[in-house]
Amino acid sequence: MKLNFSIEYRTEWGQNVEVELCFLSSEGKTHWQRIPLETGDGLIWKGLCMLKARSRQFRYTYIITDSNVQSDTGEGILRREWDVVPRLFPADDARTYFFFDHWRDVPEASYCFTDAYEVANGLKKQASASVALFPRTFLFRVLAPGLAEGERVALVGDQPTLGNWDEERALPMMPSGHGEWLISISADGLRLPFQYKYIKVGQDGSVRWEDGPNRQSPLNGQWSMVNGQWVLALSDGTIRLEVPRWKVAGLVVPLFSLRSEGSQGVGDFGDLKEMIDWTAMAGMHAIQLLPIYDTTQSRTYTDSYPYNAISVHALHPIYADLRRLPLKDKKAMASFQKKWQKLNALPALDYVEVIKMKEEYLHLLYEEERQSPMLNGQWSMFNGQIADWLLPYCVFCHLRDTYGTSQFSKWKKLSSYNRSAVTKYAESHSKEVGYYAFVQHLLHTQLAEAAEYARSRRVFLKGDLPIGISPQSVEAWHEPHLFHMDMSAGAPPDDFSRTGQNWGFPTYDWERMAEDGYRWWRQRLGGMSQYFSAYRIDHILGFFRIWQIPKGSPTALLGQFSPALPLSVGEIESYGMPFEPELFVEDATQPDRWHPRIGVIGEEAWRRLPKYEQDAFIRLYEDFYYRRHNDFWASQAMKKLPALIDASNMLVCGEDLGMVPACVGPVMQRLGILSLEIQAMPKTYGVPFAKLHENPYRSVDTIFTHDMPTLRLWWKENRERTQLYYNNVLEHDGTAPSELFGWLCEEIVAHHLNSPSMLCLISLQDWLSIDESLRNPNLEEERINVPANPKHYWRYRMHLPISKLLEAKALNERILMLIERSERA
């Protein structure tokens, strides 16, 4: 089988175009191959590949590589095509294939190809269509985002075979899944060259022709001279039609915060299904959760922090719905029910007692069920699907519990990971290690059911992708080579913390991760996509650069951005000031290269400088942090983020708050990543409040995040700020009321819903603030996190059961009316 590739792409000096080919052999094995292309003019790149192995199907994508880096791994890849909808073809060893392609950037309407869009619009997953191949075949492919249920695509052109421009004789195309349509036509019925267009056909037969000039077939070429059978594939990008803007409203709530009459002291996967009912009833289409992964390290309240997981894959046992898992021992069952009723009556989560009770229960359940033939069959299948992470996780958990610590350096056995030794350990402790796999199987089953239920109610789940991993995690033990274990990630000083934030997470070794095409990230996101249709990248700035702090530093003030372009002493002096070591921090990897010390302006070391040196340092400081790195950091992000986007069909959202370089917005826009917009944290310097009507369409609007106070709490925190908001934003005269009344809450919520943002996601507390009879009278109880307190106890729970929300007719009708008026229903 011969594959001939041709693509138009204008490269820069030192760049090459290559094809990344993946084919499935007749034995079911997947093979990868890189094919370098050649060019005579720097614009048209061509190449030939001979596939000798018998194949079922193949797919390919184009990449741009650095000619100075010779590698078959991910090293040297400068850019990738958008590949969410793959170029997938049936293989026929007797044929020659010709591909006439254009580089695929992220489409304007890339959100239409996501699971979130599919779920919210109630679209059914389309099975891939198979098309007939003739002895000589033209194969047309086009993307058609934003089609309504029942709409389809057809092809019409200037020849009898193509309908002679008669829309009633247009050739219906077949959906191939994820918004792509295709059709095969015998070349024997076509005269070259020919012209054609795509049309959209409505369920009622109405027709809409695509905009722009007619499309042109390629002229006669080498393909027409081939003896035997051939396929010429025309990948035509996206149909040229305007896509209606899609806007939805949704709910933000931590899973642990949910409460039902049957909860066991914490929100669980069963409660999630009940909350899905309320979300759908109120006209919303999304639920955003905090991370739900296992954080079990010390079994103290500090494990309540959801961003310090011991695994990026394993779900937290605390979220098991025990109502679905009854014990055979009726006496024990009754005893546990009394315990969880007491825990559920508490106003806040008692993390220590809840996890203690749930683990005790799950151990008893394991003893009762582990010999079950049905369970063993399901369990074996589950283990086989995820063995890459499950075995290390299960052994890690058993060793943690054996030695009483998750600090694996203190373990007497297997303090360093060894695959064969870990496998032998699991075999010799199969019963004990098997418990953790058993629990993960139960959790996976319950969450998968909840996700499928959400899909049936046209509600999509949005997950949270933490920026870091715990230094005491499975990943740090299993694959330490992927991380800088001697460094910690954090954030420079900002509105949340004057000394910055030291999160304690090791930073990523991006060069090592690139060697296998970011396998670690692809597996992580593939796991998330089993449950979620969208996700939030926590601190997306970390994919451009990370605030890196030497491990053990008490604060983040001694950190520096990595990667970076630090200054030489000569560069510093070129700003018109002598080198003052107190104002700088030496680069961690490059001796005699310097970073201006973050936040030093205004401190004693800066104040004692002469005025002209103060001004020179301010120029240097602003240039270094806001201009010098823009192109460099953008190029770093463009190496990493496309791999994340292509790893799944989830809608990608970024948390881009804080000290945001100018390059971040354009890169997110280019990749179709939704930004985060918070009116009280404007991205324009010196402006007290952002203007909601200026929000970009590709964004998530929210009133406040989990790191901030709720709307009512914020209203009371700063009277001067509240008065400014009341007069200038809400445009009310007079003195702002000291308490935020329900009608004012509703007005604020309506303003946010009416913003141009694609998603408007509002916290449960702020939705409930509309109704003075339902909202929590204790404002402080609604606070989820206080970032300035690294030991904060994450324990907020809603003060009333979900059933009360389902019965709250007045509130639900009010919310539905607001959503419908904002065209988000």
Can you say where each PLM-predicted feature lies in the sequence?
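Conserved alpha/beta catalytic core and glycan-binding cleft of carbohydrate-active enzymes
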Residues: 371, 613-627, 631-774, 778
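Acidic/aromatic-lined carbohydrate-recognition and catalytic surfaces
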Residues: 240-480, 511-527, 546
